[in-house]
């Protein structure tokens, strides 16, 4: 007899074995990567494949300024991002970088090309170095900078909580009454 996992309070962990998206280009990438993982036994390829399965929230975009900061002192290496590379107007000069990503915004692509850099796709990267781990730097964007994440955490209003409340409008007196102002009872 088998064990009833769910009734026994145990649930088997699930993990994605394919992307949820119906994007045909993503499916082709997954197909190519599966082959590479199987034939090269490279951990780098396995990580890329796992990240290709991820949801959009977990494939956070990476700005050009962060990319430049992370690639400082890593000359001659290829930056690999399973996600989007976005432009950042706060950075003035972009060095010549070779970047591989799922997609680039138009302005980010233009700035990388203008600086003498290169924007590669994952299939273009697989041709020169199939195991990829040589001369590459695997990066990912910040996941918790989404607006939605600001609302997570201890309830707004409890002491020492910096959680953003869900309110219809913002203003001087909204969500800052009792416990937040001395004139309204007390201030924590």
Swiss-Prot record:
Gene3D superfamilies: 3.100.10.10
Keywords: Ribonucleoprotein, Ribosomal protein
GO BP of this protein: translation
Gene Ontology MF, one: mRNA binding
Taxonomy, superkingdom: Eukaryota
GO annotations of cellular component type: cytosolic large ribosomal subunit
Family named by the database record: Belongs to the eukaryotic ribosomal protein eL18 family.
Name listed for the protein in its UniProt record: Large ribosomal subunit protein eL18z
Organism whose genome encodes this protein: Arabidopsis thaliana
Organism lineage string: Eukaryota, Viridiplantae, Streptophyta, Embryophyta, Tracheophyta
């Amino acid at each position: 007899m088998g064990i009833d996992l769910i009734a026994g309070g145990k649930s088997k962990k699930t993990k994605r074995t394919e992307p949820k998206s119906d994007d045909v280009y993503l499916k082709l990438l997954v197909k190519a990567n599966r082959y590479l993982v199987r034939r090269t036994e490279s951990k780098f390829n396995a990580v890329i494949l796992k990240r290709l399965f991820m949801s959009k929230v977990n494939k956070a975009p990476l700005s050009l300024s962060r990319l430049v900061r992370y690639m400082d002192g890593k000359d001659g290496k290829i930056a690999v991002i399973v996600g989007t590379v976005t432009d950042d107007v706060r950075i003035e000069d972009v060095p010549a970088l070779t970047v591989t990503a799922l997609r680039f915004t138009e302005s980010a692509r233009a700035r990388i090309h203008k600086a003498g850099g290169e924007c590669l796709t994952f299939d273009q990267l697989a041709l020169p170095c199939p195991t990829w781990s040589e001369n590459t730097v695997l990066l990912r964007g910040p996941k918790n900078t989404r607006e939605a994440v600001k609302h997570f955490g201890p309830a707004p209003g409890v002491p020492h909580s910096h959680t953003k409340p869900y309110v219809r409008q913002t203003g001087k007196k909204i969500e800052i009454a009792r416990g937040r102002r001395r004139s309204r009872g007390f201030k924590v």
